[in-house]
Amino acid sequence: MRKKILFVINTLSRAGAEMALLELLRKLDKEDTYELSLFVLMGQGEMIDQLPPGVHVVNERYIRTSVLEENGKKQMYRTIRHAAAVHGNALRLSVYMIRALGYMIKTKRIQPDKLLWRMIADGAERQNETYDLAVAYLEGGSAYYVADHVNAKKKAAFIHIDYTQAGYTRQLDRDCYTKFDAVFPIGENGEKKFLEVYPECKSYTHVFHNVINQDMIRRKAKSYGGFSDNYDGIRILTVGRLTPQKS
């Protein structure tokens, strides 16, 4: 009997963690031992068509637009408004959000998006299935949703950031990572920083490097186009987002 695994991610738009998840799912899909499901918390993202055929998307509704496009932003705001109305979340979580905002002001790290993830997670669709493993592939909403709203025999969470710089706190998390059976930072520095915040999670925190399709990168490197000057030496290109939370 195949093991049932649910992955949860905030959106499926074009970004590093999402690309790494797609590659991991492709590898797992080649094995016949897993029944793979995916829940996209915000229910949107343009990379849905790149999922391997064996992955079942459990969202009742899904919009194939990027959160960076104008229509995608409008859909994102609608999702947030809906989450605020479900279960009286806006009122029920008001004290939590005020306290979290107060801490952000005190530490001079005001990041409104971090305040909304709890409300979005609490207002998202619920899954009736019980899984062998549930995986929160991102911090924030995905982690809160898996910790509090998914039935699973085992739960795991990935950490893609420097947790001390990303704007999250134990108060904001409600200590959600103590509810997981495994935590996987994607690098050694990420592991070190996470354990500064959650030292009691050390026994089940292990580095899990992102899965990268090296053949695809080499193939694209040889594709037509590129620099038009006459330089024939070695070029080194780094692509990334330079923000404090990147570990």
Question: Each PLM stretch: what is its role?
Answer:
Residues 113-123, 143, 160-179:
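Nucleotide-sugar donor phosphate/pyrophosphate-binding loop at the beta->alpha transition
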Residues 154-160, 164, 178-219:
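Donor nucleotide-sugar binding/catalytic pocket of nucleotide-sugar-dependent glycosyltransferases
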Residues 5, 133-139, 144-163:
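Active-site proximal beta-strand in glycosyltransferases
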Residues 6, 227-246:
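Conserved donor-binding/catalytic core segment of Leloir-type glycosyltransferases
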Residues 14, 32-107:
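N-terminal strand-loop element at the rim of the active site
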Residues 14-15, 214, 243-247:
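A short, basic/aromatic alpha-helical/loop segment that forms part
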Residues 122, 174, 217-231, 235:
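A short helix/loop element that forms part of the nucleotide-sugar donor recognition site in Leloir-type
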Residues 85-133, 141:
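Conserved nucleotide-sugar donor-binding subdomain of glycosyltransferases
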